[in-house]
């Protein structure tokens, strides 16, 4: 027994030498009888990674310090000081405070009512206490160089895969009418872009930045699979953006590097002007497509060093993130009619009128970006059905005097190229273009992807533009259900905040880089525990 306790003390001692906790444990290796060989052996243990432990503490920049000067007092004011540690923030949520989900509603960061994002469900990717502090602070996350660089890398990858942004910029540069860019039209554009990207999967073999969403029930604390009632506040919208969808051969073993399979015109017609034709081609190719091909869901992580994260909780959260995406894609593909309704509820939760007309200038901009919807626009103009009953049978709740009319463009547009390509549309339309149209086509597209979804998922790690490592793993529905329920209980106030375990390894790998390190009562209490343990171990050694 004495020998095992001595070994424990030895381990603690070596951590003391390499950490900011050296003032807590104050006995030497000589006192514990540690040999040089034992020191060397302990030093080689995996959790004493020199690259991590010996990294100097990064002091905040002027901008970051200003950010902390605003955030830390705000959190201390809300949570109060810990009675045992004056000056340190309490790690318990005061009883008069709203639950975490209610605290997010109406903030600058979270302006959409009754909504969460996939990343917000990953409450234990780092430390849930830090996550909770940030939620109640209601201050947007500080965007340092790693975050900015990560966004740039995601944009670079998207631009390399899709020409949508380039085509749109080229059209808008010379277009003679102002093209709206408000949040309503941004949503319409993102739905259109996701539709085009998913079709491109079957020609180019990959798609990036594709929208998906699901719903989380408040009372039951679980993900919702069936239909959604629009005015039911118990079902919370959870939105996500899939970094990467990859088409591959089903029977080919998955290696560390999965290359997209370009089918060009083999399944669907490239540069097709009729999305209805694309759907018909996918329908006819269905059995053959499902037998030969599959679609992998993947997430892209950018790193500030050529190394994947070492913390198990971070890796688990990254896997769960991709599992959410995979799950949402499957549910969205189950029933096009239900998905159509879910998309409309999605828009309504964002505060948008699904019957509102999409500005004609925006519609022309979309067609200039990709002609895939051109024939559908003719159908709407002429009052014809698009072949999707929930949309074709729907009625618009608009004024009888409101008409969708592009006639003015005859007098406004002078660009011969635009006139030649789009003048057929410069007249009154029988049916307007609304979010309902894009919801209809997007719902059908999700349905065509569902049978191809692979149970193999992937995380791609990038450093300075180089995909240096991938992790491939299996979809685990049971783990996803358990984790989503645990997260729901946090957000909806059905359990207490659960900080990381108090041990030296966690202090080194988590607390060291936390904004709240200097004022966290949970860590301060952990330091005292370690100090007491060190004293007890020293006494054991002397006895």
Curated annotation (Swiss-Prot):
Reported EC number(s) for this entry are 3.1.-.-
Give the main location. Answer: mitochondrion
Q: How is the cofactor bound?
A: Binds 1 [4Fe-4S] cluster.
Q: Where does the transit peptide start and end?
A: 1-39
As cofactor, the record names: Mg(2+); [4Fe-4S] cluster
Q: State its location(s).
A: Mitochondrion
Keyword annotations of the record = 4Fe-4S, DNA-binding, Exonuclease, Hydrolase, Iron, Iron-sulfur, Magnesium, Metal-binding, Mitochondrion, Nuclease, Transit peptide
Binding-site list for [4Fe-4S] cluster: 127, 511, 514, 520
Gene Ontology biological process: interstrand cross-link repair
**What are the recorded GO MF terms, alphabetically?**
4 iron, 4 sulfur cluster binding; DNA binding; metal ion binding; single-stranded DNA 5'-3' DNA exonuclease activity
Q: Name one GO cellular component term.
A: nucleus
Provide the assembly information.
Answer: Monomer.
Q: What does this protein do, in the record's words?
A: Single strand DNA specific 5'exonuclease involved in mitochondrial DNA replication and recombination. Releases dinucleotides as main products of catalysis. Has the capacity to slide across 5'double-stranded DNA or 5'RNA sequences and resumes cutting two nucleotides downstream of the double-stranded-to-single-stranded junction or RNA-to-DNA junction, respectively.
Family label: Belongs to the EXO5 family.
Q: What is this protein called?
A: Exonuclease V, mitochondrial
What is the species of this protein? Zygosaccharomyces rouxii (strain ATCC 2623 / CBS 732 / NBRC 1130 / NCYC 568 / NRRL Y-229)
Q: What is the lineage of its organism?
A: Eukaryota, Fungi, Dikarya, Ascomycota, Saccharomycotina
């Amino acid at each position: 027994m004495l020998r095992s306790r001595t070994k424990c003390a030895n381990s603690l001692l070596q951590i003391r030498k390499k950490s900011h906790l050296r003032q807590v444990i104050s006995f030497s290796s000589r006192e514990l009888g540690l040999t040089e060989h034992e020191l060397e052996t302990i030093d080689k243990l995996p959790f004493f990674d020199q690259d991590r432990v010996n990294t100097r503490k990064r002091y905040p920049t002027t901008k970051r310090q200003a950010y902390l000067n605003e955030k830390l007092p705000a959190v201390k004011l809300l949570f109060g000081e810990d009675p045992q540690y004056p000056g340190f923030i309490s790690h318990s949520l005061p009883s008069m405070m709203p639950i975490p989900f209610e605290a997010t509603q109406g903030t600058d960061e979270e302006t959409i009512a009754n909504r969460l994002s996939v990343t917000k469900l990953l409450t234990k990717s780092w430390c849930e206490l830090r996550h909770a502090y940030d939620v109640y602070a209601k201050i947007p996350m500080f965007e340092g160089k790693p975050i900015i660089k990560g966004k740039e890398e995601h944009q670079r990858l998207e631009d390399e895969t899709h020409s949508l942004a380039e085509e749109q910029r080229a059209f808008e540069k010379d277009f003679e009418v102002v093209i709206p860019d408000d949040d309503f039209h941004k949503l319409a554009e993102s739905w259109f872009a996701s539709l085009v990207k998913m079709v491109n999967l079957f020609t180019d073999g990959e798609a990036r930045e594709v929208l998906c969403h699901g719903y989380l029930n408040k009372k039951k604390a679980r993900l919702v699979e069936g239909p959604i009632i629009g005015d039911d506040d118990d079902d919370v919208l959870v939105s996500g953006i899939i970094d990467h969808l990859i088409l591959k051969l089903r029977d080919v073993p998955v290696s560390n590097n999965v290359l997209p399979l370009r089918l060009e015109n083999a399944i669907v017609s490239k540069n097709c002007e009729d999305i209805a034709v694309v759907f018909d081609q996918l329908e006819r190719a269905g059995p053959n497509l499902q037998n030969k091909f599959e679609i992998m869901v993947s997430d892209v992580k950018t790193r500030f060093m050529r190394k994947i994260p070492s913390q198990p909780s971070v890796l688990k959260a990254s896997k769960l993130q991709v599992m959410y995406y995979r799950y949402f894609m499957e549910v969205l593909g189950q029933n096009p009619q239900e998905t159509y309704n879910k998309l409309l509820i999605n828009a309504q939760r964002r505060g948008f009128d699904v019957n509102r007309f999409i500005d004609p200038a925006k519609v022309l901009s979309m067609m200039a970006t990709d002609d895939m919807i051109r024939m559908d626009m003719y159908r709407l103009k002429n009052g014809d059905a698009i072949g999707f009953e929930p949309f074709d049978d729907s009625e618009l709740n608009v004024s009888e005097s409101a008409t969708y009319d592009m006639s003015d463009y005859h007098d406004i547009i002078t660009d011969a190229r635009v006139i030649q390509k789009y003048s057929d549309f410069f007249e009154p339309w029988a049916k307007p273009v609304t979010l309902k149209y894009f919801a209809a086509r997007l719902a059908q597209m999700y349905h065509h992807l569902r049978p191809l979804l692979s149970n193999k998922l992937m995380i791609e790690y990038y450093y300075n533009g180089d995909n240096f490592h991938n992790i491939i793993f299996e979809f685990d529905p049971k783990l996803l259900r358990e984790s989503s329920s645990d997260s729901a209980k946090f957000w909806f106030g059905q359990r207490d905040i659960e900080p990381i375990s108090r041990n030296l390894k966690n202090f080194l790998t988590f607390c060291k880089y936390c904004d709240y390190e200097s004022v966290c009562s949970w860590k301060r209490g952990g330091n005292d525990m370690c100090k007491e343990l060190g004293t007890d171990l020293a006494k054991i050694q002397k006895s």
